[in-house]
């Protein structure tokens, strides 16, 4: 196993923390805007709430998958040492 020097490991950890924070921030904003739009749509047209709900859940799943991809990439950077 090849070891990283402490400064490279620290920078990798810092980069992963910043990357995950930005991914969580973006996903949170996206989910909030999607929920806001769905609530406004249901308030305007209550009869279409079923279709709006299905589209909302599908959209939220796609948004959440971005955070999961960011987590996987961060775990690869932390534990697989791709820089060596």
UniProtKB/Swiss-Prot annotation:
Keywords (alphabetical) are: ATP synthesis, Cell membrane, CF(0), Hydrogen ion transport, Ion transport, Lipid-binding, Membrane, Transmembrane, Transmembrane helix, Transport
Cite the InterPro entries for this sequence: ATP_synth_csu_bac/chlpt, ATP_synth_F0_csu, ATP_synth_F0_csu_DDCD_BS, ATPase_proteolipid_c-like_dom, F/V-ATP_Csub_sf
Q: Where is this site: Reversibly protonated during proton transport?
A: 64
Topology in membrane: Multi-pass membrane protein
GO MF, one annotated term: proton-transporting ATP synthase activity, rotational mechanism
Query: What is the predominant subcellular site recorded for this chain?
Result: membrane
User: Got a GO cellular component term for this one?
Assistant: proton-transporting two-sector ATPase complex, proton-transporting domain
Transmembrane portions of the chain: 9-29, 57-77
Q: Where in the cell is it found?
A: Cell membrane
- Entry keyword annotation includes Protease: no
Role according to the record: F(1)F(0) ATP synthase produces ATP from ADP in the presence of a proton or sodium gradient. F-type ATPases consist of two structural domains, F(1) containing the extramembraneous catalytic core and F(0) containing the membrane proton channel, linked together by a central stalk and a peripheral stalk. During catalysis, ATP synthesis in the catalytic domain of F(1) is coupled via a rotary mechanism of the central stalk subunits to proton translocation.
Q: Note the PANTHER family from the entry.
A: ATP SYNTHASE LIPID-BINDING PROTEIN, MITOCHONDRIAL, ATPASE PROTEIN 9
Q: Mind telling me which NCBIfam families this protein's record contains?
A: ATP_synt_c (TIGR01260)
Oligomeric and partner information: F-type ATPases have 2 components, F(1) - the catalytic core - and F(0) - the membrane proton channel. F(1) has five subunits: alpha(3), beta(3), gamma(1), delta(1), epsilon(1). F(0) has three main subunits: a(1), b(2) and c(10-14). The alpha and beta chains form an alternating ring which encloses part of the gamma chain. F(1) is attached to F(0) by a central stalk formed by the gamma and epsilon chains, while a peripheral stalk is formed by the delta and b chains.
The similarity annotation says: Belongs to the ATPase C chain family.
Please state what the protein is called: ATP synthase subunit c
- Which organism does this record belong to? Lawsonia intracellularis (strain PHE/MN1-00)
